[in-house]
A protein has these predicted regions:
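N-terminal low-complexity or simple alpha-helical regulatory segments
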Residues: 4-160, 179
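Alpha-helical bundle regulatory/interaction domains
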Residues: 129-238
Length: 238
């Protein structure tokens, strides 16, 4: 059983205060391929988690950060926001430097589980997974201004559609695959391993063999679909 600690509550309250101030105060500008402070932005925590995965994969991080324009102070600023569309260059550079055509999958596989934040608290303080999911979707802007995750029942099966309001990012292969697996790992964490993924849909076309996708997701993975979507048993909702 996961326990809600005092430190977790304090971090969650801090995150909520940050969200509440979004429309009233300027957000600290980080020079990471920035095109202006009004653009859509992601939580800097996402890049910080990806950094941990890059360390595990022993990638050339100084070269990656230099080519992406990432400033070192970003790794220590939990309140930083990075330009959402910078993901396009970020994933291009990661694939180029690593030589890994499935770098999105492998980054997600090595990333620490997203925890100690308000979204985790919303799940752990809810009576059911379904309630926690509904509550957390209302706060997805904490992760990204562009997040468009939605819950839907399809033929008796629970699903989560994952998308972005950015036309440049919403069908980005590495990003879609990394976000999908990041969600699966997070859901497994908050349910003590009871979350069972049935299948995954992606809008992009498969490049190469699907064996690595099946290994990592542990289920059927279909490409060239109408949307990016996770399918799972509805039993976990109650």
């Amino acid at each position: 059983m996961l326990v809600i600690s005092v430190s977790m509550v304090n971090e969650c309250l801090q995150s909520l205060l940050v969200l509440a101030r979004f429309n009233s105060y300027p957000i600290k500008k980080i020079e990471f391929m920035s095109g202006g402070i009004a653009e859509l932005r992601d939580s800097g925590v996402l890049l910080q988690l990806a950094y941990q995965a890059m360390l595990e994969l022993e990638l050339n991080i100084p070269l990656i950060f230099e080519r992406c324009g990432v400033q070192p102070e970003l790794l220590n600023d939990r309140n930083a926001r990075t330009p959402h569309n910078a993901q396009v260059l970020f994933w291009q550079v990661l694939e180029d430097v690593s030589g890994d055509c499935n770098i999105g999958l492998h980054i997600a596989e090595k990333m620490p589980v997203y925890k100690g934040q308000v979204l985790q608290y919303l799940f752990l303080s809810s009576p059911t997974f379904g309630d926690g999911l509904t509550r957390s979707l209302n706060y997805q802007r904490l992760l990204s201004d562009a997040a468009l995750a939605t819950f839907e029942m399809i033929n008796g099966e629970a699903t989560i559609k994952v998308s972005s309001s950015s036309e440049k990012v919403k069908d980005l292969r590495h990003s879609s695959e990394a976000v999908a697996f990041g969600l699966v790992r997070f859901f497994n964490y908050v349910t003590d391993g009871r979350f069972n993924l049935n299948k995954v849909h992606f809008t992009h076309v498969l490049e190469g063999c699907a064996a690595e996708h099946v290994r990592i997701y542990g289920c059927d993975v279909l490409f060239g679909q109408a949307d990016n979507r996770l399918f799972f048993s509805a039993d976990i909702l109650n």
